[in-house]
Design a protein with these regions (language model features):
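Hydrophobic ligand-binding cavity/cleft-lining segments
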Residues: 1-62
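A conserved amphipathic terminal alpha-helix motif
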Residues: 2-8, 129-172
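A generic structural micro-feature
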Residues: 18-20, 75-77, 102-106, 118-120
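Intrinsic-disorder/low-complexity, polar/charged segments enriched in Ser/Thr/Lys/Arg/Asp/Glu/Gln
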Residues: 21-27, 70, 80, 93, ...
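Hydrophobic/aromatic beta-strand elements that line small-molecule binding cavities or substrate pockets
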Residues: 26-28, 81-87, 98, 108-116, ...
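Glycine-rich portal/gate segments that line the openings of hydrophobic small-molecule binding cavities
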Residues: 30, 49-50, 58-103, 155-171
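A short, structured loop/turn motif at beta-sheet edges
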Residues: 32-36, 86-92, 113-123
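Short, solvent-exposed aromatic-acidic interface loops
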Residues: 99-103, 127-134
Length: 172
């Protein structure tokens, strides 16, 4: 995890982490929950299988440095996917990249952002960026099912963060 290149003096820009296009733009509104609590739930690798429908198991690496976080998620369909946190600025946002032998999304980078809109209320955003879905069969399959899988997963996440109004906009 790192806070570079964004600092308190410079605004955050996803372009500092990827040039891939936005493919999925998702959000969950939450109430009666602090942004820090929402961030803690979404940012905890051990909780991924509690809400993401394709996640079977998560193994977090021992941190090699104080500011690094890497872990591996075993997914139905994708197998083992490595996730590396590129930016960690709790409770506002984090950015991670994901890759794996059977992970069809090339140059995948995601942004998780929590915005407080009122005391103990706000919006959790999850944006997925990638250049392509590798393979014709994967393109046909994932362009149809990925938005729905993520929506179902965010509905499950909503139960953990007192969320509602799940929205998924696909650019696939």
């Amino acid at each position: 995890m790192t806070s570079a290149p964004a600092t308190s003096d410079t605004p955050f820009a996803i372009g500092d982490y990827t040039s891939a296009p936005l493919r999925l733009d998702m959000q969950v509104r939450f109430t009666n929950q602090s942004p820090a609590t929402v961030f803690d739930v979404m940012g905890d690798p051990a909780q991924i299988q509690n809400w993401y429908v394709l996640a079977k198991d998560t193994v977090v690496d021992e941190q090699t440095a104080k500011d690094e976080l890497q872990f591996e998620v075993d997914f139905i369909l994708f197998g083992k996917v490595r996730e590396e946190v590129l930016l960690w600025t709790p409770p506002q946002r984090y950015v991670y990249r994901a890759f794996g032998e059977h992970f069809p999304f090339k140059d995948y980078v995601a942004l998780i952002e929590v915005e407080e809109t009122a005391p103990n209320a706000g919006v959790l955003r999850w944006q997925q960026y990638f250049t392509e879905i590798e393979g014709e069969d994967n393109q046909r399959l994932h362009s149809v099912i990925l938005p729905h899988l993520n929506e179902v997963s965010l509905q499950r996440l909503a139960t953990l963060i007192n969320g509602s109004d799940v929205s998924v906009v696909s650019h696939l």
